[in-house]
Amino acid sequence: DIRNSDYNIKRNWYYNNPNETSLYGRKCNITEQTWFSTKSLFPALTKFFYGREENLSLTGSYKDRMKFRLSETYLLLAEAYLGMDDTQRAADAVNEVRGRAGATMIDAGAMTMDFLLDERIRELVGEESRRFTLVRTNKLIDRVKAHNTTIKDKITQRDLLWPIPQAIIDSNRDVEFPQNPGYN
């Protein structure tokens, strides 16, 4: 699966200051004491790297940004088919995406909402608003409890919606505009 390749996810870091001749080009060992916190070294997505050899810290770009991708459309189609209990057509839609990524094909028996959500994150990591997807599929609370040890005991149904800013509520003078449940 090319989506997990070393090119697409940067896992290794190298010293790139040519003035530091003893370190230049050497792989950073994240257990070393360095000038930065080792907590800041983690796998990074290269799909948003815009640096150039002459300016590796380039943060801005005129590169076009994607709003919609064909793979996202196929994954939404698979979600719709799952909603109709048509796992074969859902698997066919997912396999369009997996084929492009060089991943193995799946069969209808493996097609579940959890598998589809995992496929979405493999394909759309860094692009989609994951929270909205998990709320839409009614999986936010289950996924947080399973994977987020920090807040797994704190998340509730209230957290599916965000509070409406008081200024918005106050600006609706001609109608009653209630706050979302749990935020009163």
Report the location of each language-model feature.
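Extended, hydrophobic/aromatic-rich amphipathic alpha-helical segments that build helical scaffolds
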Residues: 1, 5-6, 65-99, 113-123
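Flexible, polar/acidic helix-loop-strand segments at domain edges
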Residues: 1-69
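Residue-level detector of solvent-exposed, low-hydrophobicity positions
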Residues: 14, 20, 31, 42-43, ...
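Long, intrinsically disordered, low-complexity segments
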Residues: 57, 64-67, 98, 106-184
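A generic helix-loop boundary/linker signal
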Residues: 60-61, 87, 93, 105-107
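Short arginine-rich
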Residues: 102
